[in-house]
Design a protein with these regions (language model features):
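N-terminal export signals
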Residues: 1, 5-23
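Structured C-terminal subdomain patch of bacterial secreted/periplasmic proteins
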Residues: 27, 128, 222, 226-291
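A short, structured surface patch at a secondary-structure boundary
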Residues: 28, 34-86
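Extracytoplasmic substrate-binding proteins
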Residues: 28, 109-175, 202, 266, ...
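Alpha-helical, coiled-coil/dimerization segments enriched in small aliphatic residues
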Residues: 55, 185-210
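Short helix-initiation/N-cap motifs at beta->coil->alpha
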Residues: 72-80, 206-216
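Proline-aspartate-enriched helix->loop->beta-strand connector
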Residues: 87-93, 224-225
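Ligand-binding pocket segment of bilobal, Venus flytrap-like solute-binding proteins
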Residues: 181, 211-232
Length: 291
């Protein structure tokens, strides 16, 4: 695939790379990991069910979830009766759900794929998962196209942002007006930073999922850092922050270097990584245009 061809796969955000085969009987897949589900959709395969449609519509957003996909409830307490009614051929799970694996195996064979591990490297895990899923559903060429398109897109964003990449950036999600999750080592966002040539302002250790939960005062360590925060904000947080002396003393507040990002699935795979690169690049170029 040429670089131009790979980039073309992202002209329309998250357009499906493939259409399901009209001849082969598709596997009936229940997918309990949104990162795996978004990858399947990009391969042109719709699972019969996921867990938590409301979570998808709030945080994952893209690719859109087809309305016919069922919702089996929460991750840790899926509706086993509904699962049985769906008659899946396979259930895709993640290590986080190993505690309920025996229950799931009463319904269908379970395949566990871990995008997030103690070792980190979620980008490499996403690449491996893309190939594993593509092999499972007979979409090997589409899987390689998705990998090539993702790498090519990041190269293009890196070129676009090169003149604007000098200052580091904090990426946070607000837990409440005083505390945030800040994303760093082992996170999907860090992997994207590395590939598009940006510096992360948060260099301290993080947990299994690639974030630290800190008070907002801990964001004052870098005098020239920018802040990118992910929507949605907790109810009432915006008004409380504007009245907070601690918040108003932050260097990025005084320098007016704050960027609002639409929701991105921070625990996703290649589609989430691409969405993050796209919305962050838009915010950075918009900030530069405003001067």
């Amino acid at each position: 695939m040429t670089r131009r061809g790979a980039l073309g796969l992202f002209v329309l955000p998250f357009a499906a790379i493939a259409s399901p085969s009209a001849t082969a009987k598709p596997l009936r897949i229940v997918c309990l990991d949104d990162g795996l589900a978004e990858t399947l959709l990009m391969l042109g395969v719709s699972p019969v069910a996921i867990a938590g449609r409301d979570i998808w519509e709030t945080w994952v957003v893209e690719p859109p979830l087809p309305p016919e996909i069922a919702d089996v409830g929460t991750l840790l307490e899926p509706n086993l009766e509904l699962l049985q009614q769906l008659r899946p051929d396979i259930i895709l799970s993640m290590p986080y759900l190993d505690g309920i694996k025996p229950l799931l195996e009463r319904v269908a064979p379970v395949t566990t794929i871990g995008l997030y591990t103690e070792a980190g490297q979620p980008y490499q895990r996403a690449l491996e998962a893309t190939r594993q899923l593509a092999g499972l559903v007979g979409k090997e060429s589409e899987g390689e196209a998705l990998i090539a398109a993702t790498d090519a897109y990041f190269s293009e964003v890196r070129r676009q942002l090169a003149p604007l990449s000098a200052r580091p950036i904090y990426v946070v999600s607000f837990m409440d007006p005083r505390n945030v999750r800040v994303y760093g080592k082992k996170s999907l966002f860090q992997e994207v930073f590395d590939r598009i040539g940006l510096a992360n302002a948060w260099t301290a250790e993080t947990n299994y999922w690639g974030f630290s939960t800190i008070g907002i005062d801990a964001l004052a360590t870098s005098s020239d850092a920018r802040l990118a925060y992910l929507e949605p904000l907790p109810e009432g947080a915006g008004g409380t922050l504007t009245e907070s002396p601690v918040w108003n003393a932050m260097p990025f507040v005084r320098n007016r270097s704050i960027m609002r990002l639409p929701a991105v699935h921070m625990f996703g795979a290649f589609p989430s990584a691409t969405r993050f690169a796209r919305v962050l690049a838009s915010a950075i170029t918009g900030e530069a245009a405003r001067g």
